[in-house]
Amino acid sequence: MRIIAGKYKGRRIICPEGKTVRPTSDMVRSATFNILNNIVDWENANALDVCCGTGAFGIEALSRGVKFAAFIDSSREAIEATRHNLAKVNEDPAHYEIYSNAVENLPAARRQFDVIYIDPPYSAGLVPKALKSLREKGWLAEKPIIIVETGEREKIIFPPEFEVRDERRYGNTKLLRIKLV
């Protein structure tokens, strides 16, 4: 896996072996950032990588110039991989935080996030819980841009204050752009 663009372009990042982390393919990550590039002012945004796995989304956002990124995962292997990958690109620790929490048990937010990528284990039912927790704990900016990665056949019932604005398929992966209404 490599960082696609920005100051860390071409840098390799690691993924833990085994089945605890399912990394987003470079193709899907590239498609995600192609969508976001048209609607995000990277230099004035904070990015949140939920169920971060390797931290690839947040590191890619840092590479493209976000002010700050946060990473959330409950897997010890994912947190270790994310720490390793951030150290590997030599990112300044003042520009990120890592939370080893389950999405249902988040602390109150220290800041709000403009761009949120949620990539839980497929069919785990975590997306509605994550959205509810992020909203209730103050993690979402006033008009956040939320991307959810799911399996192509997964059906998600979103909380009523969220609606799907765009849906795209890439192989067996589906990307949903969600709006807070």
Predicted regions and their residues:
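Class I S-adenosyl-L-methionine-dependent methyltransferase catalytic core
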Residues: 1-181
